[in-house]
Amino acid sequence: MSYLPCELHCHTVHSDGKFTVKELQNNANDDHLALIALTDHNTTSGCDELDDNILPSIKGIEWTTYFGHMLVLGANGFVDWRDAVPDNIDDKIKQVKAKGGVVGVAHPYQLGSPMCTGGRWEFNIHDWRNVDYMEIWHQSFSFDNYENDKAVELWTSLLDKGYRISATYGRDWHSNDDKGHFGCTYLDIDGEINQKNALAAIRMGKTIVSTGAKMFFRVHQKGNTYNIGETLRKGLTIFSFFIDLHSREKNIIDDEIEYKSIKVITNGGECVMESAITERHVRIDLKRNHWYRAELWGTINGIEKPLVITSPIYTD
């Protein structure tokens, strides 16, 4: 279990970014990231320039359409995005999955036209089982950001319907011109850090969305231990929390951060437990056919918000 900081939404001069591919990888190294995904708009031309000796990287693309932006990671071949429209997106996603790709919804509530044509998600997905992840947090953190709040609400509603969708953060990294408090996605990568194992972590729900601090949990039940993304039975459990508040401390710039509590959230956004961050082991009686995620709450510059959100565990 590693939980390594990754950036899964990056652009270069092959679309509208300012980095060359090598500059992007070097900047990610300087930012102490373990892995990136190159997701230029409607092109994979930069992927051939990726050098895993500089930094392990995922080959991807951001489908940039009039009806939303969709991230495709690791597909073994081309799927035509140019004729993607609201009512054929399920078929398009199936084509991506058939080529081994991982599918993510980018910034579903970003401002659309005229600010960013197609930036808001307007595709009509009927089978969310084929969607692997959703960007619930996007770009720099300003905590009056309704776009992120709405994305978390959408993700929660899909979890309630039984869809197992991983949560991610996307910096949407184009350059270093923009200043701000940028987060990361922590991936629990099993084995070597590479595209294959990173994609497996996303598929399996082993993801944590964070403003910087690292928090994850394990669940103990009847002699067995379960990790984020896994499924267990209903009944009495012990949740064990692991927290590193200084994991990416350099990224907080001048923000004043205070970490206050851990919450466990379940169906409907209900909080079933809240404890001080010093309390690392709690008992929770899990219900059948539910999901449970952990959130680290605190304040940034006096505004109270979740600072870490994990993907859930599930009960059957």
Description of each model-found segment:
Residues 97, 159, 203-206:
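Generic secondary-structure transition motif, activating predominantly at the C-termini of alpha-helices
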Residues 1-3, 23, 166, 173-316:
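C-terminal functional module detector
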Residues 52-54, 130, 163, 182-183:
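Short, structured coil segments at secondary-structure junctions
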